[in-house]
Structures are given as structure tokens and as C-alpha cells.
Amino acid sequence: MPDYHTNNVYACPYLATQTVLSGKWNILLLHHIEEGPIRFNELHRRLDRISQATLTKQLRQLEEDGLITRKVYAQVPPKVEYELSEIGQEFRLVLEQIETFGDKYINFVKSKKSE
């Protein structure tokens, strides 16, 4: 049985999920990576407000957390692709729900502003 009254991230499913959601760019990165293997420069183009250093850091963290895999091809120039890992694939349903909620929330905010 999960312990919902703990600070141990790996004992509480809410805290474990919160760690995935906590990175500023994690949700957007996972959204773009879920579409299929993607290269670093393509991610950087899609997220034009993120610096290369921050993108590198966030990708390393997602890889360390086991949510994405990094495949390096032995060629010149170097080619690296990122894709969702097996456990990262499980996060797809969460991303769909986030998108659904986000759309509803945007409409809610717009309707409140027009009142």
C-alpha cells in the first residue's frame, strides 16, 4: 500500500509523479519526444526559449530518471536521438490528460477574462 504521508519520493506515487512534472521543461520535452525519435537540434528548434545548456541538463535528467533513452550513432558528424523509454511510454496517458486539462483551463481563463 502506498504511503501518502511520507517525504520519500519512492514510497508515494504522487511524489514520484511530481518529480517527473517538476522540471520546467519536462512536460514539453516529453511531449515532443513522444512523437518518435528526435534529435537534439530539432528539440532546440521546437523549444526556442530554452538554452542549449538547459536543454542538455533536462535531457540528462530525464535519461537518468529512466524516462527517455539516448541513442548515439557511430558516424561523423555525431548523431544522437532521444525517445521515450518503456516506462516513459507509460507517461503518454498522463500527457494526454495534461493536454485535455490545459485546453479546458485555457477556455476557462478566456471566459473569465471576457466577463
Name what the model sees in each region.
Residues 2, 31, 89-115:
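Amphipathic alpha-helical dimerization/coiled-coil segments
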Residues 61:
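Alpha-helical DNA-recognition elements
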Residues 8-54, 75, 81, 112:
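N-terminal helix-turn-helix DNA-binding core of bacterial DNA-binding proteins
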Residues 74-98:
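Basic, amphipathic "hinge/linker" alpha-helix immediately C-terminal to the N-terminal HTH DNA-binding motif
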Residues 1-9:
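N-terminal intrinsically disordered/low-complexity leader segments
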